[in-house]
Amino acid sequence: MTTLAIDIGGTKLAAALIDKNLRISQRRELPTPASKTPDALREALKALVEPLRAEARQVAIASTGIIQEGMLLALNPHNLGGLLHFPLVQTLETIAGLPTLAVNDAQAAAWAEYHALPDDIRDMVFITVSTGVGGGVVCDCKLLTGKGGLAGHLGHTLADPHGPVCGCGRVGCVEAIASGRGMAAAARDDLAGCDAKTLFIRAGEGHQQARHLVSQSAQVIARMIADVKATTDCQCVVIGGSVGLAEGYLEQVRAFLMQEPAPYHVALSAARYRHDAGLLGAALLAQGDTL
């Protein structure tokens, strides 16, 4: 069965046809509407989906935010702008005329990455470090989503009780410090206004403050992984996202994790599917692959 998979992110929308063997074809991208209004997103999704829907039998959506009864919600409402409570599933069912499933993008990516691991792995955690910090947990071969869709939102665990206020309302969340947005917000002096990509470039050039911001992010993620290991006893952790996959970042996370006591050590690896993980994971779930 061919699935029309859609990935809704903060900066871009992606769609592709995915067959039962996870082969991707006709991948398309559009920028996420800057206005973040329901009408703008509806029109963008229509333009994205229209050329593909005739060849699909179902729709699978991986989206930023929390998916609750087909509705788009968020711990950090600022991430969604005017899209809070957007009827995501109903909208796609109307546009495509096909049965539709929706899941959080990090949860979907976790499911895809889990399927790329050896068969003896039953417990794993996926962490994406990008504009924000998200995650997905697979326990005993089952993806944990939670009744309210909240499971795996690891970026909103505590990193520093005296840290910056997070958009979710808590103080010192991992996301507020370690994410690309958090790093950029902490940049000062000649780095003020720089995005995460620029900070990594400047860090590579030896800029002291940029190196500190990248290192601080990696250390916060490593400590979070130690907490995750203690909570889930996972066999491995897979790291993805634009920050997580940046050159040299995983090595720093690994080095900081090794400074933690031995019981908290866990195998780390880079995401295999990279920017297609959400599409593939959503397609797997829509195809009924819930083990």
Curated annotation (Swiss-Prot):
This is N-acetylmannosamine kinase. One of its GO terms (biological process) is N-acetylneuraminate catabolic process. Signal peptide: none annotated. Zn(2+) binds at residues 156, 166, 168, 173. PROSITE patterns: ROK. The keyword Cytoplasm does not apply. HAMAP family: ManNAc_kinase. It comes from Salmonella gallinarum (strain 287/91 / NCTC 13346). Homodimer. One of its GO terms (molecular function) is zinc ion binding. Keywords: ATP-binding, Carbohydrate metabolism, Kinase, Metal-binding, Nucleotide-binding, Transferase, Zinc. Catalyzes the phosphorylation of N-acetylmannosamine (ManNAc) to ManNAc-6-P. ATP binds at residues 5-12, 132-139. Its EC number is 2.7.1.60. It is an enzyme of class 2 (transferase). Belongs to the ROK (NagC/XylR) family. NanK subfamily. Gene3D superfamilies: 3.30.420.40. Pathway: Amino-sugar metabolism; N-acetylneuraminate degradation; D-fructose 6-phosphate from N-acetylneuraminate: step 2/5. Pfam families: ROK. It catalyses: an N-acyl-D-mannosamine + ATP = an N-acyl-D-mannosamine 6-phosphate + ADP + H(+). InterPro entries: ATPase_NBD (IPR043129), ManNAc_kinase_bac (IPR023945), ROK (IPR000600), ROK_cs (IPR049874).
